[in-house]
UniProtKB/Swiss-Prot annotation:
Phosphorylated. Residues 90-119 have a biased composition (Polar residues). This is Replication protein E1. Its EC number is 5.6.2.4. InterPro entries: Helicase_SF3_DNA-vir, P-loop_NTPase, PPV_DNA_helicase_E1_C, PPV_DNA_helicase_E1_N, PPV_E1_DBD, PPV_E1_DBD_sf, Rep_E1_papillomaV, Znf_lg_T-Ag_D1_dom_sf. The lineage of its organism: Viruses, Monodnaviria, Shotokuvirae, Cossaviricota, Papovaviricetes.
Length: 638
């Protein structure tokens, strides 16, 4: 029933309304002084009395806004109702399966029913029964079918169900979003997630991820270059990763392609330092906001030309973003001038490198020379060869031959100069003099003994350092042998016929901690060794060799000159006693530093007193000409 005084402006509305007043005048009513009964009321005096222009505009705007809110609320309610009806009402809905898994996890019969439902979802589209709600076809449509219908309808999306009902535009948007979420849920439920990721990567990028990378089984293995693939990344995050990752790397190559899972990001990254897979996973999970199960991380194939060409060509296109300097392994395999540097392997260059760096061990040669492959073309050719073990063995053998011949060609003075040239400056000879004074050894007497010792004078070819334990005998002898690059023999191997074989190429040798049985062995078999005369030693798998015993230092807790049973050794050894315990400071460091730099300073200072020969060609350069086993090259232009 209408209210009196209204003009049906709209039921239930809160807008403005007009009211018409009815005034009746009866005869005999008193008229006020300011009113004239006879005057005609035209209303001209009330024009502009009330300004209702702004009020009417505001009223119209408020009515429009209220109507829009009501319509928007109605549309939202309808969309939510349709979504609930579609996802929760259909038996084929993936969310319905997830709900059943949580509700019926403990029931074995229901688990069997879930397996049947998961198998039913893999059937063909035409075998799916109609749910009766008009959304069956929408659930089974793939994104490709939706795109085709979008193009056929001229850009207006429409999907028809089997019952003939039309879905609204809002339903299509909701279904597309739910479809991508459903795909990720299906990925998480896969028995082999990595296989699903590899398949999707090859489908989207057209190249297998395994063709671009080499596999690291351990997550703790470090590498500076990594290939990373991230699945299901949000579009805004995929764009921001290009700026966020710059602080962690020196170079990156990023590609972003979209599929029904979201954005798949492919990255080739060179980090500022070597990192392992675990560290990179934590970093990318934070930057991309994706779980670890949606990441593939492996190092690239550095020696594959196809991989280098792939990243080089895609880097030139507009589908990728690059930052920093291109890695050298890509440049070397893609640019023409670098391809000319690839040469065949030359063993002489490898031998020259090992000789210059004084490396004679097989394993050390193989390891260190392989690390030069990025900067040395011959090392790169060595890695490409199938005969690396043979080359390493031949290189070590030839290097030892050259080193042995070089050492034999030097006298003691030349060898001391050569050893001093390999050691840096900055030592102090006073450290050695202070230690000898601490052990009550006359410094002048020690220089006289050392002079005859270095010359190999018969009967003065052996120095014995004896004293109580912990007096620094072995420290003093070993530091001297290290500087001279001498050899060490051990009495523990005396049962072998070859325990004296290290004396074959030694300039100086040491026998540490000789016991009483060792002295008896020396007195019985090695008297001529202590004399410094030529003798014969046995070598394994080789013929006997006649050599002159090098100067020998023996450390012992026994003084052979005080033992009458060793009478024949008294004239063959020079004894230097060390009676005092070796001192250390409060931090455990030795008070007297017996280092190579101090020994170099010692010999440089006492060179003339030791009566060592001066090299006549020393002013013109090195004491010996540089060894060169690589043929020279003519660099002159034609």
């Amino acid at each position: 029933m209408d209210c009196e005084g209204t003009n049906e402006e709209g039921r239930g509305c809160t807008g403005w309304f007009s009211v018409e007043a009815i005034v009746e005048k009866h005869t005999g009513d008193t008229i006020s002084d300011d009113e004239t009964d006879n005057s005609s009321d035209t209303g001209s005096d009330l024009i502009g009395f009330i300004d209702d222009s702004s009020i009417s505009d505001y009223a119209e705007q408020e009515v429009t806004q209220a109507l829009f809110q009501a319509q928007q609320k109605q549309a939202n309610t309808k969309a939510v109702r349709n979504l609930k009806r579609k996802l929760l009402g259909s038996q084929n809905s993936p969310l319905q399966d997830i709900t059943n898994q949580h509700r019926q996890q403990s029931d074995s019969q229901q688990n069997t029913h879930q397996v049947n439902n998961s198998q039913a979802k893999r059937r063909a589209v035409d075998s799916v029964p109609d749910s009766g709600y008009g959304y069956t076809e929408v659930e089974t449509l793939t994104p490709v079918q939706v795109d085709k219908q979008y193009e056929e309808n001229g850009g207006l999306p429409s999907v028809c169900s089997q019952g003939g009902s039309n879905a609204s535009v809002e339903d299509i948007d909701v279904d597309t979003h739910v479809n991508s979420v459903t795909q990720i849920c299906e990925l998480l439920k896969c028995s082999n997630v990595k296989a699903a990721l590899l398949s999707k990567f090859k489908t989207v990028y057209g190249v297998s991820f395994a063709e671009l990378v080499r596999v690291f089984k351990s997550d703790k293995t470090c590498c500076s270059d990594w290939v990373c693939a991230a699945f299901g990344v949000a579009g805004s995050v995929a764009e921001s990763i290009k700026s966020l990752i710059q602080q962690y790397c020196l170079y990156y190559h990023i590609q972003c392609l979209t599929c029904n899972w979201g954005v798949i990001v492919l990255m080739l990254v060179r980090f500022t330092c070597a990192k392992n897979r675990t560290t990179i996973k934590n970093c990318l999970c934070m930057l991309l906001n994706v779980p670890e199960t949606q990441l593939l991380i492996e190092p690239p194939k550095l020696r594959s030309t196809a991989v280098a060409l792939y990243f080089y060509k895609t880097g030139l296109s507009n589908i990728s973003e690059t930052y920093g300097d291109t890695p050298e392994w890509i440049v070397r395999q893609t640019q023409l001038e670098h391809s000319f540097d690839d040469a065949t392997f030359d063993l002489s260059k490898m031998v020259q490198w090992a000789f210059d760096h004084d490396i004679t061990d097989d394993s050390e040669i193989a390891f260190k020379y392989a690390q030069l492959a990025d900067i040395d073309s011959n090392a790169a050719a060595f890695l490409k060869s199938n005969c690396q073990a043979k080359y390493v063995k031949d290189c070590a053998t030839m290097t030892r031959h050259y080193k042995r011949a070089q050492k034999r060609s030097m006298c003691m003075s030349q060898w001391l100069q050569y050893r001093c040239s390999k050691i840096e400056e900055g030592g102090s000879w006073k450290e050695i003099a202070k230690f000898l004074r601490f052990q009550h050894v006359n410094f002048i007497y020690f220089l006289q003994v050392l002079k005859q010792f270095l010359k190999g004078t018969p009967k003065h070819n052996c120095i014995v350092i004896y004293g109580p334990p912990n007096t620094g005998k072995s420290q003093f002898a070993m530091s001297f042998i290290k500087f001279m690059q001498g050899s060490v023999i051990s009495y523990v191997n005396s049962n072998s016929h070859f325990w004296l074989q290290p004396l074959e190429d030694a300039k100086v040798a040491v026998l540490d901690d000789a016991t009483y049985s060792c002295w008896l062995y020396i007195d019985k078999y090695l008297r001529n060794f202590l004399d410094g005369n030529p003798c014969c030693i046995d070598r394994k798998h080789r013929s006997l060799l006649q050599v002159t015993c090098p100067p020998l230092i023996i450390t012992s807790n026994i003084n052979p000159q005080e033992d009458n049973s060793l009478l024949y050794l008294h004239s063959r050894v020079t004894v230097i006693p060390f009676p005092n315990t070796f001192p250390f400071d409060s931090n455990g460091n030795p008070v007297y530093a017996l280092t190579d730099v101090n020994w170099k300073s010692f010999f440089s200072t006492t060179w003339s007193r030791l009566d060592l020969e001066e090299d006549a060609d020393k002013e013109n350069g090195e004491p010996l000409p540089a060894f060169k086993c690589v043929p020279g090259e003519n660099t002159r232009l034609l």
